[in-house]
Amino acid sequence: MIQNIIFDMGGVIVDVHREEAIRQFKAIGVADADLLIHASNHRGLFLAFENGDIDSETFRRQLSAHAGKDIPMDDVVKAWKSMISQPPLNKLDFLLELRTTYKLYLLSNNNPILIEWARTSDFSEAGLPITHYFDKLYISYEMKCTKPGRLIFEKMIQDSGINPSETLFIEDGEHNIATAKELGFYLYHAVNGEDWRDAITAILR
């Protein structure tokens, strides 16, 4: 019986606009942005940022060095924010409904710039931060590891005390789904932009 639900953020809770982010990063001087930015698992400097190996200012400095020009932090923040959009209120309301019955967790490969935004009232049209919708957030840069590696899942399982056999994992990344399957989670493979409410309701019946 399912008692817990884990959601990914990008591509599940919020839509991911990879092509727009690539365009924005190229506009500020990152010519190979298309090689570094991926829908679920970034590469190079972008992966190091999500893995917690570097902080926001170090990312800005290293990105500037990579681009061969100084990139202001405001431009970095704007480029990152172009990757996602505010989540639809109907999804957020659905999360609140689920929380009356299930424990809800977020497991996300993410960086300080986007999570600091998500933890403010700007996250939703309702003026509520992402923390309002989940029992706990598990964020890659804070945990110093990223999906699809097993370690981030194992750390989450140990900290939360959940049993994978009682937990539904909702994710858009194919490789991340594969790791969760190995660990025994119930799975729903979401598609970026999808309204998955009916599908999740059917699974939970």
Question: Residue spans of the language-model regions?
Answer:
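Asp-based, Mg2+/Mn2+-dependent phosphohydrolase catalytic module
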Residues: 1-3, 111-112, 116-205
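Catalytic-core regions built around general acid/base machinery
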Residues: 90-101, 133
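Alpha-helical elements of Rossmann-like donor-binding domains used by nucleotide-donor carbohydrate transfer enzymes
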Residues: 20-23, 44, 58, 62, ...
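Alpha-helical packing segments of well-folded alpha/beta enzyme cores
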Residues: 87, 91-94, 156, 176
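Alpha-helical transmembrane segments and their immediate juxtamembrane flanks
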Residues: 91-95, 108-109, 115-116
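Hydrophobic beta-strand scaffold residues
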Residues: 104-106, 187
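Generic structural signal for small/hydrophobic residues in well-ordered secondary structure
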Residues: 8-11, 52, 98, 106, ...
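N-terminal helical cap/lid subdomain that shapes the substrate entry/recognition surface
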Residues: 2-89, 100, 111-114
